[in-house]
């Protein structure tokens, strides 16, 4: 039967005539040299051009090759020059005249720093690129153009050449003369290539006589001649993996011949003109073709190698028709790292009469099936004796070790048991593939049917699906149906099916409805897979080794290249994988972890607890993440050994004790910040404060202290934030603290915000307005003297600041009120309620109506409520007032300013200024000196002397009870100094007379 060929076109590009092609060994690139003098590099996966080189305009580039280890391309053209380029940087590395005529071919030595070039000058030359591209040997012997060269893969010191003198000559790099000559073609020979597989000493040639000849270079005879082309044969090669000979001709076709039977298997014609060049990538299934009209890349066959492993660790694989065996058990006592290539000894097991395209052990490992060339053969696994054979496009084993099925054609399926046919049936659709396992699966282009192995009855028909593969679990309870886009995990109810069959009910076209249930869909493209218990292990298109338990997918490893799963061996606890070159690696698979996860998914928590002690410590974190994903966060917190993960779980569970313990161990500001936020949200104020301090979360501390009214905390935060340079926090703290408004002005001035400082003083601290205005004026002089002169000081221009004297009185009034403890506010609140019951209060009117005598009286009586125990004494300043100013209304503002002398520090505002980037204040602003008409601001020395003259120490409180140290942090009312439009009535302040006063201390005032 014909060889099953899976041919896919990976690239097709249009261009000028392509004289040579070469495939990169590691990148998905093909190099094409053109008749127009250009060289292109194409990516055959993305279909895009990667690089373009203009090598020799108007001179054909007849040959080009990759030198991958140097990241070079080397070209030969009709101008007789060899040129070398770096294909990454596009830099020209070397250019030299190599021959006296057109350069026809260049090949690169697989290991040594050599290239060979041939030319129409009839010479072959050897070049050493590690020695400055020196010419180390010249080979002479042909009498016509030398068209092609090929290295012998079995002896890389030898090479063969083809010439238009109708001969093939075999050479050694150590001798300038040929060892022997092969003659037989009637016309010039265009191409020569060695057979790379097996032990056959063959080479192949194609010539202008339209023939392809196979030569035995040991006996120096022609073994076979292939006829079929209708024009000159331009190029020939052996497929690197499949038993194929490929030949390209000027008749526009590529013919595929079986290398053992020499039967023509397939003819390809892509309508792109003459075939000029062909190249293969050793170890792969990619073939590059160069045509008159462009470049084509084909993938012939599948990458999956013919290899199988039994439960004992014996690996049987095929190298062409040769069968070899290795034993994994020799490595079980060795310490092997995950992903490490295993060093295995192999031995010949025998040969196979067909070319193996698939190779499979049965369930007990006693027999091995080989399928290929449209036939199957069953061998004994140990002695490699033929047990059975027959025709088959595909072969699959059943779960029962003695049953198997073959697909003879698209219309005939046969089932065998103990090497005897038991059933033969014709599906109702075109059978495009079959799958083994607990049931026999048969697919068409859009349908999947499952059949009973014993009766061939349909069990279930699934429409609109055509899987790539099906993997059954060992107990037959689960299966994975792999499609192009996703994989479906199904549960098979064998007991339900068995009862239905035993009931004798007829089975319809769709089979038994309750035979399967969809458990989960894995949205991933899967290459190979296998089951270990109820765990499905697979490799996806991204070369990730994953396993799926229930609905949870876990990545075991990221593979460096695509690999294929072989088997899991319980005795070693490892998974074994193979690449396409039959290099075998392994990865540790912890069955205890999978068993634990399976128990959790089944709800068997007691069973999971029994398994937990068997799980290694280095796998506890993966278990914890699994438990978290399943909603068992408390259990995950117990199991996890990762501090970061445990902290996250403790935060989610609001377990403050565990979270605090972990935060202390790790000493992480981030952890303290998260813990502080959580503690604050659930009312653990003390813990929140400690965590926010350790995290240096100043905004969080500000929120905490303002919410709880912690004045000591506010003081600490004001100092800390200033040290840390977060002056916006410091500003807000001082804004809310009693007697700290001056610090706010200091902050604004330090940041250069003199205008804001002046306006803030005008609103909340009128006594500081002159000083702030002067600083503002001074700051403007360097930029705009005109703007500086336009600013007015309330001392120099009192007419521009009406009622300025009232704002100063209000400042003193509210300063006294703010200096009281909470207990005094409760008393005043009761007294005020009596007044409010009579009429509505108007605070502005009260302030304007206060006489100097009343003001002094209030001030003296409020001294008894000053905070001197644990906070600070209130230092008030006053001066002898004019005894004659007892009138209710102040008619002369100027005289009042002459008589008032004070210092102040108050709190309040809602204004905030971001001054994080400003410098710290070098020294705090001085309290203002007494303001007198037509006087300038007093010097600091004078201010200090005046303050010493008028400072009054607050007397002790009358009430011996402890003073409440917490202050009420309430924004101070804005002092509006705008003049009222009409005269305000005198305020009723008689309630102030009721404030108890210690008369023994009154004389001090």
Swiss-Prot record:
It comes from Dictyostelium discoideum. Residues 908-948, 973-1005 are annotated as: Disordered. It is found in: Cytoplasm; Golgi apparatus membrane; Cytoplasmic vesicle, COPI-coated vesicle membrane. Residues 829-853 form a coiled coil. The coatomer is a cytosolic protein complex that binds to dilysine motifs and reversibly associates with Golgi non-clathrin-coated vesicles, which further mediate biosynthetic protein transport from the ER, via the Golgi up to the trans Golgi network. Coatomer complex is required for budding from Golgi membranes, and is essential for the retrograde Golgi-to-ER transport of dilysine-tagged proteins. One of its GO terms (cellular component) is COPI vesicle coat. Belongs to the WD repeat COPB2 family. Oligomeric complex that consists of at least the alpha, beta, beta', gamma, delta, epsilon and zeta subunits. The keyword Protein transport applies. Residues 908-918 have a biased composition (Low complexity). Keywords: Coiled coil, Cytoplasm, Cytoplasmic vesicle, ER-Golgi transport, Golgi apparatus, Membrane, Protein transport, Repeat, Transport, WD repeat. GO terms for molecular function: structural molecule activity. GO terms for biological process: endoplasmic reticulum to Golgi vesicle-mediated transport; intra-Golgi vesicle-mediated transport; intracellular protein transport; retrograde vesicle-mediated transport, Golgi to endoplasmic reticulum. Residues 919-929, 974-987 have a biased composition (Polar residues). PANTHER family: COATOMER, COATOMER SUBUNIT BETA. The keyword Transferase does not apply. It is a peripheral membrane protein. This is Coatomer subunit beta'. WD repeats lie at residues 13-54, 56-95, 98-137, 141-181, 184-225, 228-267, 349-389, 391-426.
